[in-house]
Amino acid sequence: MTKQVLVELGERSYPIEIGQNLFSNSEPLARYLQHKNILIVTNETIAPLYLQSVEAMLSDFACATPVILPDGEQYKTLEQMNAIFTSLLEQNLGRDTVLIALGGGVIGDMTGFAAASYQRGVDFIQIPTTLLSQVDSSVGGKTAVNHPLGKNMIGAFYQPKCVLIDTNCLSTLPKREFAAGMAEVIKYGVIWDAEFFQWLENNVEALKSLDTQALEYAISRCCEIKAEVVEKDETEQAVRALLNLGHTFGHAIEAEMGYGVWLHGEAVSAGTVLAAMTSNKLGLVDESIVCRITALLAAFDLPITAPETMDFEQFIKHMRRDKKVLKGQLRLVLPEGIGQAGIYSDVTDELLEEVINCA
């Protein structure tokens, strides 16, 4: 049975279809593909697993030769995105084209940005294959590539026409990638839904064993929360920034260690602990909240400490480039309890240094 979550954005509203064996039926996508050319963008890891199934699903439609990119965060670059543009141009594909992102967050972000940019905008569809992309990056219209000086620094807000989430894809996901996705799942509980956080605490083993019902509930609940937040604040002027819990610290880890060395979710996990510790130092939460957050992340085998090789100066160098910085002031998303968070711009460098040195 398929679960549908609707992201309501007026004329740009779109459905998120969640279920099993969704690659066997093109019906959820058909309305977006009629009289269109289709270009699938995927990577070298996903192509052998799912490209043939998706092409078979779309056999009644006009599919161009797909683009198969290298796999990894280190390839989330303008250079690789240019390969998408080259394929579009070499195959004479115009504005009547739909790009389909078949892969994880890197493929989704690059394909979405290419769609936003090509001939000033063509349609695109997300088919996320990793847990992280299913619960987070495929929903909400954030598209981007990295720059050597910062993560996701070049991009656009551009919503997909549809998101198709087949939970069967998680059966081929490496355990490390699954754990990385759980960092984003846990984030939703911390910032928005205390009951969901408690449910996660009670269902660790079910999720780690890929129990179908547990996975579908977790994914759908995350998508519901993400949709609710995006509907309130599509372009991250206010409440949507809460979705960046752990990301200011996490992006610093990714940039300093080298993109792809730490997975995004791993860096977010360590960053979430640092954010919780900062909250504790400010008196926003007591030690028990920090312990609950840390214990749940650790239960999914996620890192809960920063890299030993990173010092405060390395952190702050990258954190100052964060997209939430306003008038030169660092703005941090910090837990205020389980199920609630806030944005703080009055955290001193001295306090941050104390937290980072303790981590």
Curated annotation (Swiss-Prot):
Cofactor binding mode and count: Binds 1 divalent metal cation per subunit. Can use either Co(2+) or Zn(2+).
GO CC field: cytoplasm
Binding site for NAD(+): 71-76, 105-109, 129-130, 142, 151, 169-172
Locations listed in the record: Cytoplasm
Sorted UniProt keywords: Amino-acid biosynthesis, Aromatic amino acid biosynthesis, Cobalt, Cytoplasm, Lyase, Metal-binding, NAD, Nucleotide-binding, Zinc
Metabolic or biological pathway: Metabolic intermediate biosynthesis; chorismate biosynthesis; chorismate from D-erythrose 4-phosphate and phosphoenolpyruvate: step 2/7
Reaction(s) this enzyme catalyzes, per UniProt: 7-phospho-2-dehydro-3-deoxy-D-arabino-heptonate = 3-dehydroquinate + phosphate
MF terms (GO), sorted A to Z: 3-dehydroquinate synthase activity; metal ion binding; nucleotide binding
Example GO BP: chorismate biosynthetic process
EC number: 4.2.3.4
Chain sites annotated for binding Zn(2+): E184, H247, H264
InterPro entries referenced in this protein's UniProt entry, alphabetically: Dehydroquinate_synthase, DHQ_synth_AroB, DHQ_synth_fam, DHQS/DOIS_N, DHQS_C
Cofactor(s), names only, from the UniProt record: Co(2+); Zn(2+); NAD(+)
Pfam families, per database record: DHQ_synthase (PF01761), DHQS_C (PF24621)
Keyword tRNA processing: no
Domain of life: Bacteria
Broad class of enzyme this protein falls into: lyase
Similarity annotation: Belongs to the sugar phosphate cyclases superfamily. Dehydroquinate synthase family.
Function: Catalyzes the conversion of 3-deoxy-D-arabino-heptulosonate 7-phosphate (DAHP) to dehydroquinate (DHQ).
Protein name: 3-dehydroquinate synthase
